[in-house]
């Protein structure tokens, strides 16, 4: 996809959870297509590393330390962005909580962590983001992977979908959409289809599309060869 087709050249885009996984890959994708990337992550070293990687691609990038599940962090992050750039053109918020605990073994603390990292963070980003977006801006949320099918993870995903629907109805001038990866991140090039979806949803060719949650099928990486395990099987 060309920069002209996407219409991202010179746009100011904030990517949360940018330090690793899908967030890192998406930050790279926006940088490759000419956007100025604000890399936000709770770990400032990871945010700084990704910003440097984006700059190496020829784009402008700055790191900001921010935990989107903490309302004071969210507020201060958007205030810093406003001081530096004014209004944003777009936001990509990546939910980052993981739970592989069976439903019947789920403890209260883990449940609250899931709600905080995924639902609260999405709510806070939408609340603040909608105040700091330029006209016709966008918010794209990367939801928990579809492979997580335990009741508690499905309920979190549906709650975030509800926020997308509600924001779309309340703010029809903003393109609020979501993407659901089929699995957890494993790295380039296997996560590239999700990056393309996150770029395509906000491109000029997708103008008018809002309130949509797309499921993105990602290829499975090849199994790693474990020579020592193979040798142990020899007689």
Predicted feature residues:
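C-terminal helical subdomain
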Residues: 173-174, 178-235
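Substrate-binding pocket helix/loop in short-chain dehydrogenase/reductase
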Residues: 102-103, 110-115
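A short, exposed helix-loop element centered on a Lys and neighboring polar residues
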Residues: 126-127, 165
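Conserved glycine-rich cofactor-binding loop
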Residues: 19-20
């Amino acid at each position: 996809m060309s920069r002209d087709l996407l219409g991202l050249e010179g746009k100011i885009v904030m990517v949360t959870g940018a330090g690793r996984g899908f967030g890192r890959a998406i930050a790279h994708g926006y940088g490759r297509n000419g956007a100025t990337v604000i890399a936000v992550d709770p770990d400032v070293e990871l945010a700084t590393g990704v910003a440097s990687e984006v700059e190496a691609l020829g784009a402008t990038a700055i790191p900001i330390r921010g935990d989107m599940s903490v309302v004071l962090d969210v507020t201060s992050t958007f205030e810093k962005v406003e001081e530096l750039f004014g209004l944003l053109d777009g936001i990509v918020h990546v939910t980052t909580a993981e739970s592989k605990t069976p439903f019947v073994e789920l403890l209260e603390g883990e449940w609250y962590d899931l709600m905080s990292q995924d639902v609260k963070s999405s709510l806070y980003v939408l609340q603040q983001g909608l105040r700091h977006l330029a006209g016709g801006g966008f918010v794209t949320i990367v939801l928990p992977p579809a492979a997580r099918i335990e009741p508690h993870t499905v309920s979190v995903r549906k709650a975030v979908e509800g926020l997308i629907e509600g924001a779309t109805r309340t703010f029809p001038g903003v393109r609020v959409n979501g993407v659901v990866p089929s699995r957890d991140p494993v790295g380039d090039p296997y996560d590239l289809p999700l990056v393309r979806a996150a770029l395509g949803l906000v491109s000029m060719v997708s103008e008018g599309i809002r309130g949509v949650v797309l499921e993105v099928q990602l290829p499975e990486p090849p199994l790693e060869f474990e020579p020592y395990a193979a040798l142990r099987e020899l007689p």
